[in-house]
């Protein structure tokens, strides 16, 4: 609708049209950046980044109840315990960044994980080595301003390719297939040596 035609439209409808015009991009950007799509810098969605940051804060080399990790992560993530728990289980099932104990289910059989109060987790040595470096990490205030959280983590490995990613946002979606860990190591070495390489997706469930 052209601006000159707005004169014939009731003021309430004009306000709604302006709200849509002004706020839709803000809403879409929020969903894309804050929930659905991983950041290419570290290959993590916000909930995944907050889980790892929280696990690093409480890390003492011992296993922690998943319920405790979820509660600690809620200091940084405003979207509820269920979203945190689901994301934590999904990362744990990939057996890369999180060392698990108890019944975590199996993506190959469709079995679900036990309740958070019955299973435990801690960071793997691999995660401690390649994900964190406080000297080069930029921080921002958490959603309520009480804490600081990483803008992104200084990951030294192509996590987004190792874990894969899937998400639906406003006006777009992402689906990145997982890749084999050993293949990624070889390709990372090839990149450092400025040599050509070819890599194909891999599937944890054998599909």
Where do the language-model regions lie?
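Catalytic phosphate-handling regions of large nucleic-acid enzymes and associated NTPases
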Residues: 1-207
């Amino acid at each position: 609708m052209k601006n000159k035609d707005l004169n014939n439209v009731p003021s309430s409808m004009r306000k709604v049209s302006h709200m849509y015009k002004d706020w839709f991009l803000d809403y879409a950007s929020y969903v894309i950046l804050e929930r659905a799509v991983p950041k290419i810098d570290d290959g993590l969605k916000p909930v995944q980044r907050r889980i790892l940051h929280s696990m690093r804060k409480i890390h003492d080399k011992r296993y922690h109840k998943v319920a405790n990790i979820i509660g600690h992560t809620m200091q940084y993530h405003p979207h509820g315990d269920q979203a945190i728990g689901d994301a934590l289980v999904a990362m744990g099932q990939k057996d890369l960044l999180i060392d698990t104990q108890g019944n975590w289910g199996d993506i190959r059989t469709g079995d679900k994980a036990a309740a958070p109060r019955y299973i435990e987790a801690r960071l793997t040595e691999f995660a401690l080595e390649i994900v964190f470096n406080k000297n080069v990490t930029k921080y921002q205030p958490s959603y309520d301003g009480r804490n600081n959280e990483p803008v992104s983590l200084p990951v030294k490995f192509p996590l987004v390719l190792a874990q894969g990613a899937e998400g639906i946002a406003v006006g777009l979606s992402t689906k990145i297939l997982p890749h084999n860990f050993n293949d990624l190591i070889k390709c990372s070495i090839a990149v450092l040596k400025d040599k050509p390489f070819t890599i194909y997706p891999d599937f944890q469930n054998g599909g």
